[in-house]
Amino acid sequence: MKKLAISVLLVCSILSAQSQTKTSENIVIVTMDGLRWQEIFGGADSLLSTDTAGRYSTTYIKENFWAPTDEDRKRKLMPFFWDELAAKGVILGSRKYGNHFENANPYFFSYPGYNEIFTGYPDTAVNSNDKILNKNENVLEFLNKQQGFKGKVAAFGSWDVFTYILNAKRAGILVNDGFLDVKGTLNDRQKLFNTLQHEMPDLFHGAERLDALTFNMGFEYMKAHKPRVMYFGLGDTDEFAHAGMYDLYLDAARKSDAWIRKLWNYVQSDPFYANKTTLIITTDHGRGEAKEGKWKHHGQETPESKQLWMAAIGPSIKPAGEVKTSGLANQGQIAATIAELLGKTFKTNHTVLPALNFSKP
């Protein structure tokens, strides 16, 4: 607890937060499962880009992602992050500058990570990826109980465990994950995506649909229903990493960056959302180092997979770009941050880690 208190003070000083918060009216959250901080801040890894023993095309990587410097490579991989978000928002987790963003839970895999993100509680009893209904209240559930938010909270995820992580039935929120169809009155694009998800190759054996479907299904829902709190849970990066396909892992990251750009452009152009919406982007866990193939894995056997990153942009966020000051913050601080940016205090019957304070007056 002493370490956490010091960490919170460091983060607050790093980001020069003011004493009074400018709140947002809406929040959009995007997670990219298992995307390493090394790629976010350095682009294609030099050790993996030339590994001819891998299950991927080094020629494709060279043609599409390679550049001589880290700065150029990260911009080729994540152009929205580095051309727009870094200029107008904040990015935490650049370990080369001693800025650390980490799991507080000790497991470093998906269910515990998502539980920590949304409940603010790094519960050691949450220790598997099994389809067990989460007993911990999450911030989406909390917000759905607040005046003006009821029925205006939605989550779309590729992985079919989000229904359990977010405990959709108890929470009373829409959670569309796995291969669930979107229900209700649908436009032609929504009908098409419902059909396509059952006709496209099932690359991940029934547990997860492709992110292109998840994003577009969620995006169409967002445009049609204007939720005040919207979550997109993307998963291709983790699946391709586990398969050892570094080229497709990079491709999935760049496609995610393009979708986030599309999402942000929409948010900034739609009167309901424009200048009233904050976007938060992060990951559930990191991965091992490139050497010895550890990048394919995560968990307690690869302790470096606790190393994460987080980004935010919007009217509540003080622009700081890539934070280059040393400090430590935890994934579990995101839940309280989401609530605080909306002018709420996330209180429940379990511990909630304190909010990050990177807002502007």
Describe the predicted segments one by one.
Residues 22, 216, 230, 237-277, ...:
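A long, amphipathic alpha-helix that forms part
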Residues 27-31, 38-39, 92-95, 116-118, ...:
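Structural recognition of the beta-strand scaffold that forms the well-ordered cores
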Residues 20-90:
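Active-site-proximal N-terminal segment of extracellular/periplasmic enzymes that hydrolyze or transfer
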Residues 104-229, 233-242:
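His/Asp/Glu-rich, glycine-adjacent segments
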Residues 28-29, 37, 257-296, 338:
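Metal-dependent active-site segment of extracytoplasmic phospho-/sulfohydrolases and closely related
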Residues 1-23:
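Bacterial Sec-dependent N-terminal signal peptides
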Residues 51, 282-313:
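Histidine-centered active-site microenvironments of extracellular/periplasmic hydrolases
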Residues 141, 146-147, 325-358:
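Non-catalytic, well-ordered alpha-helical segments in soluble enzyme domains
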